[in-house]
Amino acid sequence: MNDDNQQSAHDVDASGSLVSDTHHRRLSGAQKLIVGGVVLALSLSLIWLGGREKKENGDAPPSTMIATNTKPFHPAPIDVTLDPPAAQEAVQPTAPPPARSEPERHEPRPEETPIFAYTSGDQGTSKRVQQGETDRRREGNGEDSPLPKVEVSAENDLSIRMKPTELQPTRATLLPHPDFMVTEGTIIPCILQTAIDTSLAGYVKCVLPWDVRGTTNNVVLLDRGTTVVGEIQRGLQQGDARVFVLWDRAETPDHAMISLASPSADELGRSGLPGTVDNHFWQRFSGAMLLSVVQGAFQAASTYAGSSGGGTSFNSVQNNGEQTADTALKATINIPPTLKKNQGDTVSIFVARDLDFSGIYQLRMAGRAARGRDRRP
């Protein structure tokens, strides 16, 4: 029994509430004062913060609302000064016109000022603004006509190639004396009387083997046996295989002379005279080759002497041999080639200008026609 009473005294009501318990619901007087003070302090803090915000808002300057410009854009008017009228002769004195008062300058209003709109979506407004700015510039410059169009050049490779070369026209003329003319471009064969050696510049001579006739092929102008003198102005250079000869003048057996000033050619009319070319290979490289052989011998000797411990003197001799070979090669490497052509070879004269013999030759009638003309009274 005692155990049962003791267990019932200490059992806790599981369904009961600790807050509603009589022991926990009662507060002491000191605790009540503390709770009341905390609540009062919080209330005063909230009231003080609210009054401070109202004071700050009252001290701030009032904000002004910017009115939106909804009127359409109008360009600002521009004052155009008219040119003064031309002075006219006064017939009688007249009273001077009253002084015109200067017009008051029109100050553009805010809605008349140009507006630059930069929008990504409304492209129509931007185009209207740009058009209005363009119109204002045209009015300021006094232009009523549309803006000039910029012409784009259409030049290209095809159009340039389609343009023909414009040459000056030439007028045809007749030869004044065709019987006594040897025209430009005529090729005259000639046989060399002197051999050619281009080691030095000099003169050459040839003889015409046939008669040379005029343009009509009726009159002999240069008889067979006419001698022609030419000159070699310079020798050959490295790589040349022909020599240039300039024929100066021709002299006929009747001692008629004419200046030619025409270049030489071969039998087929190719410029220059061919011949046997001597490049002087051994003269140019024989000394260097000999010195190279000697230098190789000294190098072998220096190698042998170096193995035996006495190669100092041989090395100095080898270096001197290299310098001597270089000097000999530089002295002989620039020897020019020489062309030789035998006496009696056939060459050609390419006539470079018209030859006129009308000053020394004349035509006269011969045979029966001449005798019949002489018998006429």
Swiss-Prot record:
Annotated compartments: Cell inner membrane
One GO-annotated biological process of the protein: protein secretion by the type IV secretion system
Entry keywords, A to Z: Cell inner membrane, Cell membrane, Crown gall tumor, Membrane, Plasmid, Transmembrane, Transmembrane helix
Residues that span the membrane, as ranges: 33-50
Biased composition (Basic and acidic residues): 101-112
Keyword Kinase applies: no
Membrane disposition: Single-pass membrane protein
Region (Disordered): 53-152
Cited InterPro entries: T4SS_VirB10/PtlG, T4SS_VirB10/TraB/TrbI, T4SS_VirB10/TrbI
Highest taxon listed in the record's lineage: Bacteria
Main location: membrane
Residue ranges, compositional bias (Polar residues): 120-132
Molecular functions (GO terms): identical protein binding
GO CC terms of this entry: plasma membrane; type IV secretion system complex
NCBIfam families listed in its UniProt record: PRK13855.1, T4SS_VirB10
Family to which this protein belongs: Belongs to the TrbI/VirB10 family.
Function in brief: VirB proteins are suggested to act at the bacterial surface and there play an important role in directing T-DNA transfer to plant cells.
Protein name (record): Protein virB10
Originating organism: Agrobacterium fabrum (strain C58 / ATCC 33970)
The organism's taxonomic lineage, starting at the top: Bacteria, Pseudomonadati, Pseudomonadota, Alphaproteobacteria, Hyphomicrobiales
Gene name per UniProt: virB10
